[in-house]
């Protein structure tokens, strides 16, 4: 693979990550507060927000998965680098983002849905010290943290994908 192809793949990766981060940030910072303020029930607002977050989770899988093309293209091209260089650090951050996607969509979101289904009533009707309310609040807090950490990772990965090596370095003795 030549440098031009790698540059195009990097631009595609950055664009997808920025697109997802913008959508997630727009929802998290702008739309979710409006839902909870304007809708008559926090339960309805939470249900709608949960549906949107579920779709953003799937979009995150797509964005982060396709961003892996930047790493995969370098692997195919056998781009070499130092032991701890930008490619390895970027790859580690990318894997962390994928693990966060997995945790969110396979562990936390199903747990929140199971708690809501088990309760069968609006969350705010439960006492603050109710075991279901405590479990729901904890899962919801973890969900929010994973959501915003993935936004930060998407922005970081998009901003640094251009720093990844693009050509195979000749390994020779250094003087």
Model-derived features: where do they sit?
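Interfacial loop at the N-terminal end of multi-pass membrane proteins
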Residues: 2-88, 113-137, 172-174
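Alpha-helical membrane-spanning segments of integral membrane proteins, especially the hydrophobic core
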Residues: 86-99, 138-141
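Hydrophobic alpha-helical membrane-insertion segments
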Residues: 18-22, 93-109
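C-terminal/domain-terminus segments
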Residues: 162, 169-175
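Selective detector of the "anchor" transmembrane alpha-helix that sits immediately C-terminal
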Residues: 19, 62-69, 145-166
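Helix-loop junctions at the membrane-solvent interface of multi-pass transporters
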Residues: 39, 73, 107, 160-163
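Membrane-embedded alpha-helical bundles that form the substrate/pore pathway
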Residues: 54-57, 141-148
């Amino acid at each position: 693979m030549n440098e031009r192809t790698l540059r195009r793949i990097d631009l595609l990766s950055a664009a997808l990550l920025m697109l997802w981060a913008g959508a997630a940030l727009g929802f998290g910072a702008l739309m979710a507060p409006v839902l909870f303020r304007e809708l008559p029930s926090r339960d309805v607002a939470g249900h709608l927000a949960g549906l949107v977050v579920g779709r953003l989770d799937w979009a995150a899988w797509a964005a982060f998965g396709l961003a892996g093309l930047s790493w995969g293209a370098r692997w195919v091209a056998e781009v070499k680098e130092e032991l701890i260089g930008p490619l390895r650090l970027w790859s580690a951050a990318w894997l962390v983002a994928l693990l966060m996607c997995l945790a969110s969509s396979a562990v936390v979101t199903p747990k929140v849905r199971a708690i809501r289904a088990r309760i069968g009533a609006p969350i705010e009707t439960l006492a603050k010290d109710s075991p279901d309310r405590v479990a729901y609040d904890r899962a919801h807090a973890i969900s929010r943290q994973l959501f915003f950490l993935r936004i930060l990772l998407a922005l970081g990965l998009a901003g640094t994908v251009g720093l990844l090596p693009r050509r195979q370095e000749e390994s020779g003795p250094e003087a």
